[in-house]
């Protein structure tokens, strides 16, 4: 994994909705929950938690889809229905990294909901959780991720 080159832009599959990231992620993850499996039509979803002030929709009007819940809002392109990002805490936005023009920098630092993980799946995530990390662990995880992202993990 390397640092994300900023600003980073991306779009849905049809290009109707365009996004931009102007801040480094605070955490990267793979989620194995059944909801992510179904919404992504894959074994897991990949996302980067971006500080809210470092994320913007440049063009288009994403629509809320997936499960309707005031605390968990999944945004899709209304035209091609690509799942683009999720908002559930005011401090950050979970961006589906494959919506970015270049996702080659990405690797998941944590994996969540491994209790629903398909038996053949493996990821390079450093931390695994059968559910989600307890809220009190996020400060430690984001600090460790920042240190890891700075390249300290490569120097041994």
Predicted features along the sequence, with ranges:
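A short Gly-Trp-Pro
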Residues: 1-11, 16-156
